[in-house]
Amino acid sequence: MALGKNKRISKGGKRSKRGKAQETMARKEWYDVVAPANFEKRQFAKTICNKTQGTRIAADVLRGRVFEANLADLNQSAGEEEAYRKVRFTVQEVQGRNLLTQFHSMEVTTDKMASLLRKWCTTMETTVEVKTADGYTMRLFVVAFTKPQANQQSRNCYAKQRLVKWLRMRITKMIKRRLSKVQIKEAVSLLTRNVLSDALVRRCNPILPLRELRIRKVRVVRTPKFDAQALLSAHGTIPASVEADQREVEEAVEAAPAAEKAAE
């Protein structure tokens, strides 16, 4: 009786052409993500990437990555009051083990926006697109809520449509006037330190009494041609990545015993 092939029995004479499997983490490197100089905490995150091999360059893979951080972690002097805002950065240049980033967007958390909603008031929203002095086009989403006037007897505080249009026009003019004269670095400082929103409240309160006015979202929709000198001036003194050097030493120490075993 002829026996058929048993697929469960592997042939002992056949060997794999591949060598010993290399550990995945041995092919990777750690990098520090650095925020611009107008934030207190510069190195706010770490990321990992494969080492440069042949035509696949690690710097090209890292450029364009977007990282998100909490504003309270970036500006620790502000405390937990700024924990409701998230700031995103995009990598533009790789310098050693440091990733130099630029502002990408900012957004208010969903739970904070839900806490601002009330009954018996008017919610006003407007969108403003402005171009900074150095060529960045930013789109701002502003939301405002009315409040009752002093000695008001009525329960609600609804606003008339003509006042809402007037308020939107004033917000648009003021944002364009303030942000079109500054560069992206100063514009981010005005947004993150509530300088612009406080100025908007002071200018809009004579039209309508406002309970809250927030810039709920900011996006960079268009960027100018990459300028390395402008990026370096925005970062100023870049902190040294001491931990990256320590990691290289640890990798060398771990690789030494493995090389000795292979030689034996």
Curated annotation (Swiss-Prot):
**A GO MF term:** structural constituent of ribosome
Instruction: Write down the InterPro entries for this protein, in alphabetical order.
Output: Ribosomal_eS1 (IPR001593), Ribosomal_eS1_euk (IPR027500)
The annotated region (Disordered) lies at 1-23
Classification via SMART domains:
Ribosomal_S3Ae
What's the superkingdom here? Eukaryota
**Which species does the entry assign this protein to?**
Leishmania infantum
GO CC: one term?
A: cytosolic small ribosomal subunit
Task: Output the HAMAP family linked to this UniProt entry.
Answer: Ribosomal_eS1_euk
How is the subunit organization of this protein annotated in UniProt?
Component of the small ribosomal subunit. Mature ribosomes consist of a small (40S) and a large (60S) subunit. The 40S subunit contains about 33 different proteins and 1 molecule of RNA (18S). The 60S subunit contains about 49 different proteins and 3 molecules of RNA (25S, 5.8S and 5S).
Q: What is this protein called?
A: Small ribosomal subunit protein eS1A
Subcellular localization, per the record?
Answer: Cytoplasm
Print the keywords alphabetically: Cytoplasm, Ribonucleoprotein, Ribosomal protein
Keyword tRNA-binding present in the record's keywords: the answer is: no
Q: Name one GO biological process term.
A: translation
Comp. bias regions, Basic residues: 1-19
